[in-house]
């Protein structure tokens, strides 16, 4: 009996202690919620989630919470608060909440993108960043690789002159090959079946993640048959089989004196860890084959469909705004001409092109809602208390479409990134984070910026891109997903007359 009384007293003491600890703490305003289902009945079901959450700010403010099942999640839609989470308190908010679907993608939190903060995540992120240093000079210089793939894409399009085609597949293949060179030191021919396989499992995973996932809110639902979960498992299995085959080939030819890819760096780290030739806390457990595959899969997921999607968005907006395309081509003609192909140094002169890229990244961000963060301890955001383990989601769409930060935010206006004279690039608002910020920022930002600029400069130097005859410009609504995708559309490809004339002149002078 006395044991029962003691237990009761301890329970009451803990209750009053916890109440006193949170007494006076201010929580963000919350959506209504019901037992079991939480706020689900009060979240708009039609339209893009990022737009719906942005609209909810009108009632609940730039930071608010909602219940997903029994879990309280905080939504951030203001730059100052987002910067606090991502940068000022980036370490404290660097955690990742466990989600069924993301766990399936990452073999339960391995790799970089979906891994919780900790030693393994830091190691793999550091190695991924180090891989870009392998491509600084010589024939393996990153810019040279990108230019080669951009030129190959242009050569392919020359065979489709005056035709209307969907550019998504050739663009996807070009970007995939760049990532394959970085990851494995391998490039594939356009007709190689492995490219079709990569495209298939990538699209399969993205399409699966685009569905509503009640299993992420109610994990116990996994005991029942679930088509979405089955589809994710199927495509992840194919992905891992492809990457495992490449990993084994890389192991066979591995030479510690010739490190030329991210896979080599990971294999080297694994070898050092296995031989205890590593720092304390960096053991071989962090470099199992599944850890390596998860990291490579993250680079694939973050580096292929994202860049390919943005290129499609840029082309789509140029089809809607042909006067912008003409301004870019005029810049190319005046600053580069046709005797050479563009380089990244030309970015200082092709200001309208760079401004267009920045505007597309604003108006159609790659990830309208960033992957959820999680508080690693009891924290605060602004004046609000955030308990440990609370998921926090940055609504990037809200940052990029705030009328307080942007003039006519829903209007495509590349000139907003230029000064009044059009001679300098500017940042009109700090509320602009296309690649995130802080410890969880996109590790491929430098690569992506080079790819977007060089591919578009190469394309517009040689071709006119127009709406096909008797067709309408592409729909700009897009499909909300982990990556913000545009619906497939066709483009009429026409070799520019100025390019033809320049090539004819070159041929005339050849002996």
Curated annotation (Swiss-Prot):
Pathway: Steroid hormone biosynthesis; Steroid biosynthesis; glucocorticoid biosynthesis. InterPro entries: Cyt_P450, Cyt_P450_CS, Cyt_P450_E_grp-I, Cyt_P450_sf. Keywords: Endoplasmic reticulum, Heme, Iron, Lipid metabolism, Lyase, Membrane, Metal-binding, Microsome, Monooxygenase, Oxidoreductase, Steroidogenesis. The keyword Oxidoreductase applies. GO terms for biological process: glucocorticoid biosynthetic process; hormone biosynthetic process; progesterone metabolic process; steroid metabolic process. The keyword Transport does not apply. Gene3D superfamilies: Cytochrome P450. It holds the Pfam family p450. Heme binds at residue 442. Its EC number is 1.14.14.19, 1.14.14.32. Regulated predominantly by intracellular cAMP levels. The 17,20-lyase activity is stimulated by cytochrome b5, which acts as an allosteric effector increasing the Vmax of the lyase activity. Belongs to the cytochrome P450 family. A cytochrome P450 monooxygenase involved in corticoid and androgen biosynthesis. Catalyzes 17-alpha hydroxylation of C21 steroids, which is common for both pathways. A second oxidative step, required only for androgen synthesis, involves an acyl-carbon cleavage. The 17-alpha hydroxy intermediates, as part of adrenal glucocorticoids biosynthesis pathway, are precursors of cortisol. PANTHER family: STEROID 17-ALPHA-HYDROXYLASE/17,20 LYASE, STEROID 17-ALPHA-HYDROXYLASE_17,20 LYASE. This is Steroid 17-alpha-hydroxylase/17,20 lyase. The lineage of its organism: Eukaryota, Metazoa, Chordata, Craniata, Vertebrata. The gene is CYP17A1.
């Amino acid at each position: 009996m006395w044991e029962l009384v003691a237990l009761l007293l301890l329970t009451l003491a803990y209750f009053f202690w916890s109440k006193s600890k949170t007494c006076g703490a201010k929580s963000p305003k919350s959506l209504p919620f019901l037992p079991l289902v939480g706020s689900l009945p009060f979240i708009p079901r039609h339209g893009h989630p990022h737009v719906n959450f942005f609209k909810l700010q009108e009632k609940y403010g730039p930071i608010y919470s909602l219940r997903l099942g029994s879990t309280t999640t905080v939504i951030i839609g203001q730059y100052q608060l987002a910067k606090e989470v991502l940068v000022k308190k980036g370490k404290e908010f660097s955690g990742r909440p466990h989600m069924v679907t993301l766990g399936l993608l990452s073999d339960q939190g391995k790799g970089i993108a979906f891994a919780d903060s900790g030693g393994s995540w830091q190691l793999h992120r550091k190695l991924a960043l180090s891989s870009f240093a392998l491509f600084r000079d010589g024939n393996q210089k990153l810019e040279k690789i990108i230019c080669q793939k951009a030129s190959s894409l242009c050569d392919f399009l020359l065979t489709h002159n005056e035709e209307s085609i969907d550019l998504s597949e050739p663009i996807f293949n070009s970007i995939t090959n760049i990532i394959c060179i970085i990851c494995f030191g391998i490039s594939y021919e356009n007709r190689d079946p492995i490219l079709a396989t990569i495209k298939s499992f990538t699209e399969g995973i993205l399409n699966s993640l685009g569905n509503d996932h009640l299993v992420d809110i109610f994990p116990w639902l996994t005991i029942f048959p679930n088509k979405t979960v089955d589809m994710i498992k199927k495509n992840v299995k194919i992905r891992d089989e492809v990457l495992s085959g490449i990993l084994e080939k890389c192991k066979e030819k591995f030479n510690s004196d010739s490190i030329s890819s991210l896979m080599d760096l990971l294999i080297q780290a694994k070898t050092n860890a296995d031989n205890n030739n590593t720092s304390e806390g960096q053991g071989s457990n962090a470099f199992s084959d599944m850890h390596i595959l998860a990291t490579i899969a993250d680079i694939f997921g973050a580096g292929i469909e994202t860049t390919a999607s943005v290129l499609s968005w840029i082309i789509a907006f140029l089809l809607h705004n042909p006067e912008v395309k003409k301004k870019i081509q005029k810049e190319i003609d005046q600053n580069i001409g046709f005797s050479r192909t563009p380089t990244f140094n030309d970015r200082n002169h092709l200001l309208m092109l760079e401004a267009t890229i920045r505007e597309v990244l604003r108006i159609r961000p790659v990830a309208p809602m960033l992957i959820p963060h999680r508080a690693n301890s009891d924290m605060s955001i602004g004046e609000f208390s955030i308990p440990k383990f609370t998921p926090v989601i940055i609504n990037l769409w809200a940052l990029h479409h705030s009328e307080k930060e942007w003039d006519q935010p829903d209007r495509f206006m590349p000139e907003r990134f230029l000064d009044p004279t059009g001679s300098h690039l500017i940042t009109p608002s700090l509320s602009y984070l296309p690649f995130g910020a802080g410890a969880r920022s996109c590790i491929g930002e430098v690569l992506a910026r080079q790819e977007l600029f060089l591919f578009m400069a190469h394309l517009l130097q040689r071709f006119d891109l127009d709406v096909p005859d008797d067709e309408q410009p592409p729909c700009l609504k897009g499909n909300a997903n982990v990556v913000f995708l545009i619906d497939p559309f066709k483009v009429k490809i026409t070799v520019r007359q100025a390019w033809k004339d320049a090539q004819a002149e070159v041929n005339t002078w050849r002996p």
